[in-house]
Amino acid sequence: MIKTCLRYFGGFISAQEKWLNKMAKKGYKLVKAGKLMYKFESCDKGKYQYCVDFIADKSHRDAESYKQFLEGCGYTVYYKNVNLGLSFGKVRFRPWAKGSGKVSSDFTTMYKELLIVEKLNDGKPFELHTSNEDKISYYKNWRNIWLTYFALFALMSLIFLFNPIVSIVLGALGICALIPVIAYQVQIGKI
């Protein structure tokens, strides 16, 4: 039986991962992931486990190489988007990324910011980032993304000082962007 679900998680990767694992516990295996759509087929309850990994900071070549590495380990891997494709033009600048990953387009990693990784459930926790250095690097990537948003909103707030309402709104958005920065820094401190 095929089951189709419409969901949008945005940047809430852990929520997406929990939902996919909940679906697996109910007896559904992911077969396709689109912008908003997830297609599942019936399977034994709890047969699969899922992990979601953020790869938007990688270049197209590095992302493809990482995907092939995971597939070589026996995992099934699906690309997934974070954004909905609502942008000006077909090129996006990612200041937090490395190397050629700073620029994404339809031909590179524009709608391939996440990897959904599936494995057979062996009863062990499923983690892709196992070493402390790996976890720190992963959390720093997320922290830096939100730090970039904070800096942009703070700068725009200063630019629009002549319009107090706009400046206050932009400043408030900047402060909101600091919440995940602090949360990821706390995670880094715990490691």
Regions picked out by a protein language model, each given a short descriptive name:
Residues 1-191:
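Terminus-proximal functional modules
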